[in-house]
Regions:
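Conserved functional acidic sites
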Residues: 27-181
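Positively charged n-region of N-terminal signal peptides that target proteins for export
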Residues: 1-4
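Bacterial signal peptide processing site
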Residues: 22-24
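Sec-dependent N-terminal signal peptides
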Residues: 6-12
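C-terminal motif of bacterial Sec signal peptides marking the signal peptidase cleavage site
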Residues: 17-20
């Protein structure tokens, strides 16, 4: 009888531990890249992963691994596409702020005459007593439904965006990880 009680008690402890573990959207390996060859495809991907999911004035909440939840207000969110005389460019951007942080993400693609180029800029800056800052032009990796922004210098993923959702994961250069709620 004691064995059964002990086994039930152990199972209860394990199930509580599993319930209390929060899932992380932190990338654990490199995604399988999806080849996007036109500016229009890149722009559509940027828009559906970033600006379409946010309206100016709305509140978005993130959980930092060492803190309670943090609410951000969308300050700016927009996308633009321009095409003329064989050249085109697409741009999508998001600026969000909390009491402690300002986060700016920009994605852009441009090209013409058979050549395409895409790039990104991300800045995660503390606005009060926080000192961690992150600013770089990361590598963009497209997968089927996500965009991964990877710092080529460090190899770390700074941000992951998901189509129809927006930001699901961020990391600053102090190693703080943020997960969307």
């Amino acid at each position: 009888m004691k064995k059964y009680v002990s086994a039930i008690f152990t199972m209860a402890i394990l199930s509580l531990a599993l319930v209390s573990c929060e899932p992380s959207n932190k990338p654990t390996k490199d995604p399988v890249p999806e080849q996007l060859t036109t500016i229009n495809d890149m722009y559509d991907s940027f828009k559906s992963c970033l600006s379409l999911n946010y309206a100016e004035g709305m509140t978005v909440t993130f959980k930092r691994e060492d803190r309670s939840n943090e609410d951000f207000t969308v300050i700016e969110s927009f996308s633009e596409y321009d095409s003329e005389e064989g050249e085109s460019a697409g741009f999508s951007a998001l600026l969000i702020e909390s009491n402690n942080w300002e986060i700016d993400i920009e994605l852009y693609a441009e090209g013409g005459y058979g050549e395409t180029y895409e790039g990104a800029y991300i800045s995660i800056v503390g606005t009060s007593s926080e000192t961690a800052e992150y600013e770089c032009e990361p590598l963009i990796i497209h997968s089927k439904d996500k965009i991964y922004l990877k710092d080529e210098a460090t190899g770390q993923y700074i941000c992951v965006l998901q189509k129809g959702v927006g930001i699901i994961y961020m990391e600053d250069n102090a190693g703080h990880t943020w997960n969307a709620l």
